[in-house]
A protein has these predicted regions:
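Acidic catalytic patch
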Residues: 14, 40-46, 73-100
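Short, flexible helix/strand-to-coil boundary loops that buttress conserved ligand/catalytic motifs
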Residues: 12, 53, 134-137
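Conserved glycosyltransferase catalytic-site signature
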Residues: 5, 106-110
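Short, well-structured N-terminal submotif of metal-dependent ribonuclease cores
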Residues: 1-41, 56-70, 146-147
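Short active-site oxyanion
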Residues: 35-39, 80-81, 117-122
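Acidic, PIN/NYN-like endoribonuclease modules and their adjacent C-terminal/linker elements
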Residues: 88, 113-147
């Protein structure tokens, strides 16, 4: 499994409306990773998490950078958690962009979907847009407790 940025943000911030759902999923995924299940952090997701969590445009009280980095560090230090090495996913990203006629704000999701396909992983997100990029075998959409 690999979490999308919205899952990490919700899990990390107690004031997030989807905190409980995300935190419960994350805790379960970390237990599973310690028992041998896949849990992969994507570099683009980590960078987006740091950018969004620390932004005063996103949160009235942004997460201090040392706290945000500490959250990621704690995940990386957890048993069974890995950080992906990327690069060869370009051909899949290219194909998704051309076949699905993607551009603009679709590109970060397309890059994450391409990396998910390349690595043979499974993505978890609150974002419904991944349905058009990944099949059921590669994607789980978490439901919000507030939705």
């Amino acid at each position: 499994m690999k979490p999308d940025v919205n899952v990490l943000l919700a899990a990390a911030r107690g004031d997030h409306p989807q905190h409980e759902v995300a935190r419960t999923w994350l805790e379960g995924a970390l237990v599973a990773a310690a028992s041998g299940a896949s849990f992969t952090l994507m570099p683009m997701v980590v960078a987006s998490f740091l950018r969004l969590a620390t932004s005063p445009r996103i949160f009235q009280v942004p997460t201090p950078i040392d706290v945000a980095v500490g959250f990621i560090d704690s995940l990386v230090a957890s048993a069974g958690v890995t950080m992906a090495t990327l690069g060869p996913e370009w051909l899949l990203l290219r194909r998704l962009c051309v076949d699905k006629r993607l551009g603009g704000n679709d590109l970060p999701d397309a890059w994450l979907a391409a990396a998910t396909l390349h690595l043979g992983e499974h993505l978890v997100s609150f974002d419904r847009n991944f349905v058009k990029l990944l099949g059921r075998a590669q994607f789980t959409r978490l439901s919000s407790a507030t939705a």
